């Protein structure tokens, strides 16, 4: 019976655990699964549908192309063994990318660039903090998170971040907590 239970747990981890329809987490550590559940709940608490996404956790940065997080086409990776405020921020940031991909129109992206005084949405020739795509994900992460960590982008005062969040999402900034 124990062997069957261990096999069942291993099979579930290999196939992922569906947290919500369209949201699947791949993690061996229960704390990482709880982190994914927390992040999904943050979207819902704010009145946003969470993105349809696969969430993968990795022990080191090799699963995220050398970074702490990575997002691409409905899949995010969080590359840390720790579950802490930085991991929460990183997961919300990467999920923010996918949410933007699935919910923000081209016209809204143009308005966001204008609001933030940016020239490009995601050109790799521009520094990370001056890309609209990165600023959008960072703003979503800040707005949905605990707001303990400062958004890692220029022009990061609360009023400016709130304006960006409202433009991207169409809703008011949620109360932190």
Sequence positions of predicted segments:
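Catalytic Zn2+-binding segment of zinc metalloproteases
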Residues: 95-111
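C-terminal region of N-terminal signal peptides and the immediate post-cleavage residues
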Residues: 3-21
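Surface-exposed patches in mature extracellular/periplasmic domains of secreted proteins
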Residues: 46-58, 107-113, 148-156
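Metalloprotease/metallohydrolase-associated module, dominated by Zn2+-dependent proteases
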Residues: 111-177
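Soluble non-cytosolic domains of exported or imported proteins
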Residues: 26-37, 81-90, 127-135
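Auxiliary, metal-adjacent structural segments of Zn-dependent hydrolase domains
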Residues: 16-72
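Active-site scaffold of zinc-dependent metalloenzymes
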Residues: 56-88, 101-102
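Structural recognition of the beta-strand scaffold that forms the well-ordered cores
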Residues: 77, 98-100, 138-143
